[in-house]
Amino acid sequence: MKFFAAKLEEGVKGGNGKPSVGPVYRNLLSEKGFPPMDSDITTAWDVFSKSVEKFPYNKVLGWRRIVDEKVGPYMWKTYKEAYGEVLQIGSAIRALGAEPGCRVGIYGVNCPQWIIAMEMTHEDVYLSFLPLAHILDRMNEEYFFRKGASVGYYHGDLNVLRDDIQELKPTYLAGVPRVFERIHEGIQKALQELNPRRRFIFNALYQHKLSWLNRGYSHSKASPMADFIAFRKIRDKLGGRIRLLVSGGAPLSCEIEEFLRVTCCCFVVQGYGLTETLGGTALGFPDEMCMLGTVGIPAVYNEIRLEEVAEMGYDPLGEIQAGEICIRGTCLFSGYYKNPELTQEVMKNGWFHTGDIGEIHPNRVLKIIDRKKNLIKLSQGEYVALENLENIYGQNSVVQDIWVYGDSFKSMLVAVIVPNPETVNRWAKDLGFTKPFEELCSLSELHDEHIILELKSTAEKNKLRKFEYIKAVTVETKPFDVERDLVTATLKNRRNNLLKYYQSANVPLYRYKSTKCTENCR
């Protein structure tokens, strides 16, 4: 078997109140020790100022003006222009009394003015749409500035992100799984509108290219014919220049990752990291199909091991190594601001305890299962990983948004679902219903029959255990949004807020006959 990471230490069995810990793994490139760091680059300012010297007239920050409710073309600042603004902002902060080394909090949306204030191959272009406080976006921007490359910001509306993509034509796109799920849904919708013959040809080309990818060929060499006939059109929808897609923030399903690898004509990988680990803790390999559904191996300056979570049955020394992911290395944070108690809680003997549950496969590749806090115990004593189930059920075309809920005093799971309007309208047309979408969502034929059967089909396809099946659904017509604080800025469910929201509206989530969310719930 091919190993992708080096094993430095064997696991240790727990005892006397101490949990078992698994083997310690490191990147093969740093098996003999972490490589030396660049002594000239110690801060974000160093990253930026060095690039100003090398690439003063390269485009660095791009944005789109909105005039009379119309979004214009991208406008750009050069490295030299941005440098001048950095000095002005730094001078203004000093004038307010801040001294070198002080902590300065900055609240900002994705725009050139804020990335300048935050100190931030020269031909690459990155589209920034994740919040600047999100480590995935911040890490990518810092890296682009190091290379003298360009960063363009979305114009503020994620629902029409495709318009920014077409205008900017990025070479690199990083996002959370929900973004790539929407790309997948859009492609699937277009496929359904093809005539049967063209759809058959597409599927045949898909399987042909996939077979060569599985034999070890790179995405560019697996089937140039299939790329030319069918898949280049999908690449064009991503701007036509895309070279790399990276998903992070939560697990992306194997099915969607495989689909993107086959059809997008570019490298597609998943990564893993946290703010506390400065972002890139682990990253997959683009042309290794055995890494589908995983986040790859430790980055060069990190070590990873798993720690036992006995009450949940996760054993890092078991046949399948599983447990809480712990990280050690030179890229860890120094501590939480004004919170030494929490710092002490997560940092133990040099290991940062992430709160994430992972598996390490026999080839030493890491897979994320869920967050410890997203694991709940049902009344019969079974633990359920809620976020993992949402990722699985969210693959079904009938689902636009889903929140899976389990009460510890109940033996089954329920869910609130926002159906995909296009899928629902197709279903209604086939059955002869002519009602608007909101009225269709109140039909028992939809929520008590069609949606439940679709979810059951997805559960069977993914070999879920019976207690992981959704037994009842509440249908909501309005997508979960940031405005109601139901999701984070990266579109992750805020579980406590969702529960409070529906409880305050007196929506009975546990019921065998489900109905549409009441009007006072909006």
Q: Across the structure, where does each feature detected by a protein language model lie?
A:
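Conserved C-terminal "lid"/linker of ANL adenylate-forming enzymes
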Residues: 376, 401-403, 450-522
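A short N-terminal helical cap/helix-turn-helix that marks the beginning
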Residues: 4-15, 39-64, 84-87, 463, ...
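Gly/Ser/Thr-rich phosphate-binding loop
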Residues: 171-174, 184-290, 399
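Conserved short alpha-helical elements in the N-terminal third of ANL/AMP-binding
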Residues: 121, 133-152, 166-167, 171
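C-terminal boundary motif of the adenylate-forming
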Residues: 357, 362, 396-423, 459-462
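Conserved ATP-binding/catalytic segment of the ANL
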Residues: 312-378, 518
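Conserved AMP-binding/adenylate-forming core of the ANL superfamily
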Residues: 36, 57-118
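Adenylate-forming
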Residues: 331-333, 346-347, 365-394, 403, ...
